[in-house]
């Protein structure tokens, strides 16, 4: 019935396979949940729908195991011509989930695999969007939006670098139309050099600061 309705309106069907709900016979075949089993399950479902005369499909394989998920996509991609929706499922809270998603999606996307993505986090879905955009931008797959780079604190830091960097990062979220890099540096010793690849940068010192543009101190 679902396939018939999808045919009627030409609506894509997402064929989803999750490591947490893999078919019992496939788990028994491989002895446990494996990348090979995830791929087999997905291809079985694809064939079933194709046999019903429908091929407007999107395929999604997800696992909370980062390396298993990456391996599954490496195995699936050569065997599948349909768009792939990529994500690390049940990745966790903001801290752990972002790390797992960045590593997993980075491995997969950097191989040219994947058409759409989702960062799955336990929390506000708005954070998922921001994280997904940053992952794509870091991999060179998305343009636009101001990138903020900042140095770690060290013994030369005499300003509230953490607070300043966070404040700048919040300010730039409104400017998706600008594709520039902003550097926030904590000292005037290494700041100018570290900010030279940024379009604009600031380097703060004790009672002083520098404004840097394209590697040149302008103020």
Mark where each language-model region is.
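Short, charged, surface-exposed secondary-structure boundary motifs
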Residues: 1, 94-97, 211-214
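Hydrophobic or amphipathic alpha-helical targeting/insertion segments
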Residues: 1-12
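Conserved, mostly hydrophobic/aromatic
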Residues: 15, 59, 108, 151, ...
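Catalytic alpha/beta core domains of metabolic enzymes, predominantly
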Residues: 18-21, 26-173
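Conserved structured catalytic cores and adjacent interaction surfaces
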Residues: 125, 154-158, 188-194, 198, ...
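Hydrophobic alpha-helical bundle architecture
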Residues: 164-196
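Mg2+-dependent phosphoryl-transfer enzymes with acidic/Ser/Thr/Gly-rich catalytic loops
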Residues: 204-219
């Amino acid at each position: 019935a679902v396939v018939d309705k999808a045919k009627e309106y030409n609506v894509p069907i997402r064929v989803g396979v999750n490591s947490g709900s893999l078919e019992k016979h496939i788990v028994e075949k491989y002895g446990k949940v494996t990348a090979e089993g995830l791929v087999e399950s997905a291809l079985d479902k694809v064939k079933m729908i194709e046999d019903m005369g429908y091929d407007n499909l999107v395929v999604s394989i997800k696992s909370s195991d980062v390396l298993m998920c990456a391996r599954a996509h490496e195995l699936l991609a050569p065997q599948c011509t349909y768009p792939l929706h990529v994500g690390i499922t049940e990745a966790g809270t903001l801290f752990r989930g972002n790390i797992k998603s960045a590593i997993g999606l980075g491995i997969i996307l950097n191989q040219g695999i994947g058409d759409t993505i989702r960062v799955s986090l336990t929390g506000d879905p708005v954070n998922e969007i921001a994280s997904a955009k940053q992952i794509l931008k870091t991999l060179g797959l998305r343009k636009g939006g101001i990138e903020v780079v900042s140095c770690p604190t060290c013994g030369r830091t005499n300003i509230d670098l953490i607070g300043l960097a966070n404040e700048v990062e919040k300010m730039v979220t409104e400017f998706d139309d600008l594709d520039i890099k902003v550097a926030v540096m904590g000292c005037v010793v290494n700041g100018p050099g570290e900010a030279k690849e940024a379009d604009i940068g600031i380097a703060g010192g004790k009672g002083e600061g520098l404004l840097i543009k394209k590697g040149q101190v302008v103020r």
